[in-house]
């Protein structure tokens, strides 16, 4: 299967010095090298066509012992895509199951860490429109008969230790079922046979029970896309104590009393300058926080589901002028917004979801889909902090973030030279460098531009840099709102198109002249200004009322919000500016200043952050290409996380360790 569920990275056994992103397939193949089951006979090398499942879906050999290092030199080479749609790792069981559903039914299930986790999912995504279709799980032995086309899921253990397994039921016979799968049998199927194994089925008054051909495995059950929930399993939820956060400390042996970062490296030097020293936060350098593996799984599921929910809300907004007007985006730009959504809906690189996670549950505050930060600390600095500290428990849940970003860039439409546009800001310096590293790793050239310095027009009106390279692709740290502010200032009611300059050497190139230029491919796309705007929150609530990850939100104060408390947020605010937290009886719990006080506001149900060791803690997850990419933690002594709030080391602990060491 594809990934270690806590986000752990395994070393590629063919190259001990190369870290690979979330490659549980290496872990699985290492085991099978020395402990290969006698039930599996390997004849055909990795990638060989073994046969076909119904619908002409190819089944490939996944004998990793025979994978060619030249053809598969790194982790990215193992990733399987059909067009823009990611299937999984070649040629794992999950890759086959997702590809089967995609080709035969036009649906896919959300990304998972291990095959057995599929049994906890409750929706499939329809690829053509991102509609969420109900998916029900039926336990092995229940009264709901399995049917052809169902997913069949195994628990981790035995032949499928660590990962579990997934197959497709192709036929249901009176006393057996036939299945198609990958990563079990590596030899060719008989001509015309469209199944890999036949499993006995016991039928009784109690229900239908499937037996595996391996005697050390457990079949969890089958999954059917249906609205009918009779005999189905409820969606599992982690117990409340699993969603708590813990504080841990390493022994102070002077590890952080001196210089532990490399001041000669530009990235390190920029980070040190921004932090005013060699430190991971402005608080205790020897403290870190931990969450359970169950909590991490819940965050993965929430991230994947919420991203799709935000896409649905964005689609609704862009189809309704009455909703779009709440976002305070100049009407001059509405056609561009809709074109961006139509043409670049799936061309995102990364964003960040902000959560409150505690024993009360998991709730999302907002989605920074436009100009997210925190990647550099989570994907680089926190690893080096842990190495310097020594004796740190668990794993960094963003360990593979840079690799994930590099892979996403490889499958993007970006030109070979990407210009990174950033503000004159110390923090943005190292954020830009981190993304530059990911781009270079992906095989691109990346040039950092501060503001619009060095950009100008040639004699034909093309936008070029100071080395005469044409600007074709831009990744920006700027929020789209900054450009919108410029547009509001410069555009007049007489304008019939965005006022983009295309010449005049004496004129200074403005941000708007870069980001709105039609031939410049900007990441993140213009449409991400919609999900990043707080005005999306009431739309989300109207589409998915009482959803377990959402907080009530409204454009106007409601009796329920007044009674139970609310947060007042400016619709295009950033960095926690101009937020008011109002408790019961209209009591002011907290308020922040900032530059967004004149904006319209939305009102969101009050849901305060948990406090651990006098720090209010906010969990954040990264999306990469629309899928979960990592987790980080921010903290502050006040209830509102702001731009200058700390990042904190975060580790994922196995549940038994988490509960055994809970303080």
Show where each model-derived region lies:
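N-terminal polybasic/positive-inside topogenic patches
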Residues: 2-5, 20-21
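Preference for protein termini
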Residues: 2-3, 232-663
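N-terminal capping segments
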Residues: 34-123
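Aromatic- and glycine-rich peptidoglycan recognition patches
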Residues: 161-235
């Amino acid at each position: 299967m594809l990934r270690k569920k806590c986000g752990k990275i395994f070393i590629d056994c063919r190259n001990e010095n190369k870290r690979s992103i979330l490659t549980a397939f290496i872990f699985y193949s290492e085991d099978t090298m020395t402990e290969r089951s006698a039930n599996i006979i390997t004849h055909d090398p990795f990638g060989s066509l073994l046969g076909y499942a119904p619908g002409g879906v190819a089944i490939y050999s996944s004998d990793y012992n025979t994978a060619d290092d030249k053809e598969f030199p790194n982790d990215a080479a193992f990733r399987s895509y059909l067009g823009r749609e990611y299937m999984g790792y070649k040629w794992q069981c999950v890759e086959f199951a997702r590809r089967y559903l995609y080709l035969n039914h036009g649906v896919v299930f959300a990304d998972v860490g291990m095959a057995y986790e599929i049994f906890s999912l409750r929706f499939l995504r329809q690829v053509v429109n991102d509609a969420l279709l109900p998916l029900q799980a039926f336990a092995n032995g229940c009264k709901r008969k399995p049917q052809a086309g169902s997913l069949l899921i195994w628990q981790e253990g035995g032949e499928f230790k660590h990962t579990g397994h997934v197959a497709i039921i192709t036929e249901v016979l009176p006393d057996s079922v036939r299945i198609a799968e990958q990563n079990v049998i590596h030899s060719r199927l008989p001509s015309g046979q469209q199944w890999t194994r036949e499993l006995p089925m016991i039928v009784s008054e109690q229900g239908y029970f499937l037996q595996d051909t391996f005697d050390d495995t457990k079949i969890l059950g089958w999954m059917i896309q249906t609205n009918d929930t009779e005999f189905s399993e409820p969606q599992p939820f982690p117990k409340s104590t699993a969603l708590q956060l813990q504080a841990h400390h390493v022994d102070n042996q002077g590890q952080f009393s001196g210089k532990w970062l490399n001041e000669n490296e530009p990235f390190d030097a920029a980070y040190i300058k921004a932090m005013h020293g060699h430190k991971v936060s402005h608080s205790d350098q020897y403290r870190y926080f931990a969450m359970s593996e169950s909590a991490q799984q819940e965050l993965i599921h929430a991230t994947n589901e919420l991203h799709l929910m935000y896409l649905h809300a964005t689609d609704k907004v862009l189809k309704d002028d009455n909703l779009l007007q709440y976002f305070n985006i100049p009407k001059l730009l509405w056609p561009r917004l809709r074109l961006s959504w139509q043409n670049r809906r799936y061309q995102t690189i990364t964003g960040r979801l902000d959560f409150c996670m505690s024993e009360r549950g998991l709730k999302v505050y907002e989605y920074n889909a436009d100009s997210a930060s925190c990647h550099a600390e989570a994907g680089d600095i926190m690893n080096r902090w842990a190495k310097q500290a020594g004796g740190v428990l668990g794993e960094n849940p963003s360990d593979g973030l840079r690799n994930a970003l590099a892979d996403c860039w490889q499958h993007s439409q970006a030109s070979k030279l990407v210009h990174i546009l950033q503000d004159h800001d110390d923090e943005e310096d190292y954020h830009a460098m981190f993304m530059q590293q990911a781009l270079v790793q992906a095989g691109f050239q990346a040039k950092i531009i501060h503001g619009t310095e060095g950009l100008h027009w040639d004699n034909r009106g093309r936008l070029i840099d100071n080395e005469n390279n044409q600007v074709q692709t831009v990744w920006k740290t700027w929020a789209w709102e900054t450009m919108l502010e410029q547009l509001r200032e410069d555009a007049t009611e007489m304008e019939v198109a965005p006022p983009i300059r295309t010449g005049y050497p004496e004129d200074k190139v403005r941000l708007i002249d870069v980001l709105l230029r039609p031939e410049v491919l900007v990441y993140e796309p213009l449409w991400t200004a919609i999900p990043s705007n707080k005005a999306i929150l009431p739309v989300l609530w109207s589409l998915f009322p009482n959803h377990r990850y959402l907080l009530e939100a409204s454009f106007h104060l409601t009796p329920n919000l007044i009674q139970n408390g609310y947060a007042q947020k400016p619709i295009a605010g950033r960095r926690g500016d101009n937020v008011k937290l109002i408790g019961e009886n209209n009591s002011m719990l907290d308020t922040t200043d900032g530059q967004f006080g004149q904006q319209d506001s939305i009102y969101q149900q009050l849901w305060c952050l948990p406090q651990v060791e006098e720090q209010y803690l906010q969990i954040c997850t990264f999306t990469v290409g629309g899928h979960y990419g990592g987790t980080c933690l921010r903290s502050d002594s006040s209830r509102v996380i702001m731009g200058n709030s700390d990042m904190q080391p975060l580790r994922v602990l196995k549940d038994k360790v988490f509960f055994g060491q809970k303080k």
